Amino acid sequence: MAFLVFAFLTLMAVETYGSLFQFRLMINYLTGKLPILSHSFYGCYCGAGGSGWPKDAIDWCCQVHDCCYGRMSASGCDPYFQPYNFSYINKNLQCVETDTSGCPRRICECDRLASICFQQHDATYNSSNIDPKRKGCGTKSPPCPN
């Protein structure tokens, strides 16, 4: 039991730096869910890595988000650890970076759009799609949208 507590706390500490922490806050604000529990191993794309065909609308949100992070990485940004500023006022998320062309703003937009996608499809959330082993995902993946 002590090992499980240690592992959980370590995972929480590792993933609270930079934009991953802010992304979690956005998801929590819009869905009321704790992303470390609700989205970390959801479907074929939510959480670290991803391949195969998305299982549902929530998983599609994650696939599109992975593609967005891929574009950020390809352009020299670090979407996992680059902090950014955002506001949440009257149930509205806004990226508030002053440099609208810089990495922080673009990464924030990736996270904001994914969080809104989760909110829009929250009624379809299916806890049976949580699977750390990602069974049934296959190898054929959809192309990233432009």
Curated annotation (Swiss-Prot):
Domain of life: Eukaryota
Main location class: secreted
Presence of keyword Transferase: no
Catalysed reaction, written as an equation: a 1,2-diacyl-sn-glycero-3-phosphocholine + H2O = a 1-acyl-sn-glycero-3-phosphocholine + a fatty acid + H(+)
Record-linked Pfam families: Phospholip_A2_1 (PF00068)
Cofactor: Ca(2+)
UniProt PTM comment: N-glycosylated. Glycosylated with mannose chains including Man2(GlcNAc), Man2(GlcNAc)2, Man2(GlcNAc)3, Man2(GlcNAc)4 and Man2(GlcNAc)5.
GO biological process, one term: glycerophospholipid catabolic process
Alphabetically ordered keywords of this record: Calcium, Disulfide bond, Glycoprotein, Hydrolase, Lipid degradation, Lipid metabolism, Metal-binding, Secreted, Signal
UniProt subcellular location: Secreted
Disulfide bond residue pairs: 44-137, 46-62, 61-117, 67-144, 68-110, 77-103, 95-108
Stored InterPro entries: PLipase_A2 (IPR001211), PLipase_A2_Asp_AS (IPR033112), PLipase_A2_dom (IPR016090), PLipase_A2_dom_sf (IPR036444), PLipase_A2_His_AS (IPR033113)
Residue runs in coiled coils: none
Glycosites: 85, 126
Binding sites annotated in the UniProt record for Ca(2+): 45, 47, 49, 66
Signal peptide: 1-18
Purpose: PLA2 catalyzes the calcium-dependent hydrolysis of the 2-acyl groups in 3-sn-phosphoglycerides.
Family recorded in the similarity comment: Belongs to the phospholipase A2 family.
Protein name: Phospholipase A2
